[in-house]
Amino acid sequence: AFKEKNIPLSQKVYSLPGADFSDISNKYDTIIVGSDQVWRPKYTGGIEKYFLSFADNRIKKIAYSASFGTDKNEYSFYEKWVCGKLIKRFDAISVREESAISLIREQLHWDVDVIQTLDPTMLLDITDYKSLVGQVVNNNKIFVYILDSSVQKISFVEKLEKVLCMPGFTITPKGMDNKSA
C-alpha cells in the first residue's frame, strides 16, 4: 500500500529473476541504474544485468547513486571480470558511499571515472517525511528490516520484543520471517 500511494511508477518493463531483457534496447535511448545494494552480487542474482549487460552500445548508460552496500569485494573472479568490462561502457557513474569509490579503484581495479553523490533519500524535503509520519498506524508491533542477518541481530530483536512486550515482524532480503502472523 505504501509503495502504490507514495512512489509513482512507470509501466513495468521486466521482473527479476530470469527476465528477458532483449527488447529493452529497442525501447529506450538512456537507461539509469541505481539503488541501495544494486551492485552487491550477494543480493541481486545475475549481477551483470545491473551493469546493463543487455543494453547495446547506442544506449546511454548512467549509474546514479549506485551502492555496493559494503566496503568489501564480494565479486567472484568471473563477476569482477565481466562487470569490469561492462562498467567501462557507462557514460556517467556516481555512487552513494565514499567507500564504493575505493572498492571500485583499489579492490576491483576498475579504471573508470566515478564520483560520490548524495543518497537519493536525502533529496526529499523534511515536509515530505513529515507527511509520511502522519500516516503511521500503531498496531503494537515492531517492524524490523535486517539486511545482513546474524545471530547477534536476531538475539537483539528477540530481547527488544520481550522488553517492549510486542511481537516483531522481521523482513530480510532472503525472505520473510513473520513471527506475529
Show the residue positions of the predicted features.
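Donor nucleotide-activated moiety binding/catalytic core segment of transferases
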Residues: 114-121, 126, 176-181
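Nucleotide-sugar donor-binding and catalytic loop/hinge architecture
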Residues: 24-27, 55-58, 128-141
